[in-house]
Curated annotation (Swiss-Prot):
Catalytic activity: (S)-malate + NAD(+) = oxaloacetate + NADH + H(+)
Function: Catalyzes the reversible oxidation of malate to oxaloacetate.
Subunit structure: Homodimer.
An example molecular function term from Gene Ontology annotations: L-malate dehydrogenase (NAD+) activity
Effect of residue 229 to Q: Decreases the thermal stability
Entry's EC annotation: 1.1.1.37
Taxonomic path: Bacteria, Pseudomonadati, Pseudomonadota, Gammaproteobacteria, Alteromonadales
NCBIfam families, sorted: MDH_euk_gproteo
GO cellular component term of the entry, any: cytoplasm
The protein's name in its UniProt record: Malate dehydrogenase
Similarity field: Belongs to the LDH/MDH superfamily. MDH type 1 family.
Positions bound to substrate: 81, 87, 119, 153
Entry keyword Oxidoreductase: yes
Length: 312
C-alpha cells in the first residue's frame, strides 16, 4: 500500500507524515511531495524512525515521482489561514493548487483514492471532481473531503464539558467543513443529555474552533497539529478498509447522492474501493434540522464556485 502526501513540508503535512510513518501497516510505502526544497530532508528525517514503512521525498514543481503507484493521495498543499482570514479567503490561491494537483493525479495515479485537506474543502473537493471528470477518470467512491477534524473537536469538547471518557463519545458531523456548514449531531451522542444552551454554545464553538486556533497562535499559523492527527485518522481508516478490513465508518465530505447537495459530509462505510456505502445520518433534533436547512444555500454556493472555477 502506497500513500502519497502532497504538501508534506507544511505544518499539516509534516505532522501527518510523522503519524503515517509510525502508524501505517508494516510494508507500506510513504512518499512525500512539496514544492519546498526541504521535502527530501523531511523524508530523511522521518526515515530514521524505526518502523517498517519506507519513505521517499520529492520537491520541485512536478509531483509525478511521488504519485507513481500511489493507492492513496492525501493533499494538504496550499496556504494556511492567518488572523482575519476565513476559509473562503484561501480560495483564490488554493483553488489553482488543487486544480493542478488533481490533474497530476488523474494523469499518474488515476485509480488512487484522494483525500483533500486543503481549504476551503467545500469548494476544493468539487474542483478536484471536475478535473477528474474532464480527464475521464472520476470515480466518486474515491474522492473525499477530510472533515475528521470537526469530529475529533466535537468529541473532545463534549468529553470535556460532560466529564466523560473520550472512549464513550462518538459525534457524527454532517454538512460541510466551514462555519455554519459544520453541523455536529449532538442529539445522537449516547448517554448524554444537553441543555438547549449547551447545544447552541457547543455547536458554535465547534464551528469556530479553527478560528480559535488561528487567534491563539497570534499570526503564527493555523490548526496544523490537530489537523495532521485528523487526516492521519482518516487516512489510516481508508488504508485499513482498502486492505479488506470490514466495518470502518468515518464522516467525510463526498459526492454521495445526498438529497441536500451534490457534496455532503455524513457517515460513510469505507471498503476496498473507497466508499462502500453512504450511510443515513439518522434523526435530527429540531435545532439540527433548522441548522441543516439554513446551511444549504451557503454549501451549494461553495460547490458551484468550485465547479465554475474549473469550467472557466
Amino acid at each position: 500500500m502506497k500513500v502519497a502526501v502532497l504538501g508534506a513540508a507544511g505544518g499539516i503535512g509534516q505532522a501527518l507524515a510523522l503519524l503515517l510513518k509510525t502508524q501505517l501497516p508494516a510494508g507500506s510505502e510513504l512518499s512525500l511531495y512539496d514544492i519546498a526544497p526541504v521535502t527530501p530532508g523531511v523524508a530523511v528525517d522521518l526515515s530514521h524512525i524505526p518502523t517498517d514503512v519506507t519513505i521517499t521525498g520529492f520537491s520541485g514543481i512536478d509531483p509525478t515521482a511521488a504519485l507513481v503507484g500511489a493507492d492513496v493521495v492525501l493533499i494538504s498543499a496550499g496556504v494556511a489561514r492567518k488572523p482575519g482570514m476565513d476559509r473562503s479567503d484561501l480560495f483564490n490561491i488554493n483553488a489553482g493548487i488543487i486544480k493542478n494537483l488533481a490533474s497530476k493525479c488523474a494523469e499518474v495515479c488515476p485509480t488512487a483514492c484522494i483525500g483533500i485537506i486543503t481549504n476551503p474543502v467545500n469548494t476544493t473537493v468539487p474542483i478536484a471532481a471536475e478535473v477528474l471528470k474532464q480527464a475521464g477518470v472520476y470515480d466518486k467512491r474515491k474522492l473525499f473531503g477530510i472533515t475528521t477534524l470537526d469530529v475529533i473537536r466535537s468529541e473532545t469538547f463534549v468529553s470535556a464539558l460532560k466529564g466523560i471518557s473520550l472512549a464513550d463519545v462518538a459525534v457524527p458531523v454532517i454538512g460541510g467543513h466551514s462555519g455554519a456548514t459544520i453541523l455536529p449531531l449532538l442529539s445522537q451522542v449516547k448517554g448524554v443529555e444537553f441543555t438547549a444552551e449547551e447545544i447552541a454554545t457547543l455547536t458554535t464553538r465547534i464551528q469556530n474552533a479553527g478560528t480559535e486556533v488561528v487567534e491563539a497562535k497570534a499570526g503564527g499559523g493555523s490548526a496544523t497539529l490537530s489537523m495532521g492527527h485528523a487526516a492521519a485518522r482518516f487516512g489510516l481508516s481508508l488504508v485499513r478498509a482498502l486492505q479488506g478490513e470490514k466495518g470502518i465508518v468515518e464522516c467525510t465530505y463526498v459526492d454521495g447522492g445526498s438529497e441536500h447537495a451534490t457534496f455532503f459530509a455524513q457517515p460513510v462505510l469505507l471498503g476496498k474501493n473507497g466508499v462502500e456505502e453512504v450511510l443515513a445520518y439518522g434523526d435530527l433534533s429540531d435545532f439540527e434540522t433548522n441548522a441543516r436547512d439554513a446551511m444549504l444555500e451557503e454549501l451549494k454556493a461553495n460547490i458551484t464556485l468550485g465547479e465554475e472555477f474549473v469550467a472557466g
